[in-house]
Amino acid sequence: MKQITLVAISLLAFLLGSCQQVSQSYYTYSGRLHTPYHIKYQYDKPLDNEIKAELDRFYYLFNAFDSTSIVSQINRNQLTQVEDSTFRSLFRTAMLVSAYTNGAYDITCAPLINLWGFGFSKQDSITPQHIDSIKQFVGYQKVQLKGKEIVKEDPRLILNCSSLADGTVCDMIADLFDKKGIQNYMIEFGGEIVTKGINQRGEYWKLGITRPVDDS
């Protein structure tokens, strides 16, 4: 009898939780920063302030165009001790991918990116000598994370976290939602996507690609 009662209580709790979840509204938070973003979630109230706080934290960590950001301070050698665990996690991921690809992926290659005009500046004439001079301070093996400290072999080395940053902000907001017990959400930021549960029609989230062809 005791076992039956426990099963009944568990089933009732599940049904009550499901009913509460179904009765909650879906909210949308969208806009454009350096890239468009779109966030949809089911909860008992909007979380605009909390989401904005995570976006602000994201930009404070990784925005290379903001001179006050953590990554900018590291690049200027004004900061070496990184207290934020999200930044350290992204750095460790970047090092793992760099090692796995034997350097084909490298978050220290920003000076070479700039050389071809894809970053902050563009060089009018590019020579092999110029490339070689820049390669002296490019390479993932030339920077390490020791505890909380970023250690560079060459002070001219700079980091560009943009290739992992958009996925990271999706994870940051997903973590916010998970801590609040949100079961249904979709987070899209610059083409990086995290989903959980179902949409407002009671279906699994469906993702589409505008131009599903190579080089689109």
Predicted regions and their residues:
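Short, linear, compositionally biased motifs with a strong N-terminal bias
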Residues: 10-11
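Mature catalytic core of soluble alpha/beta enzymes
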Residues: 4-7, 17-216
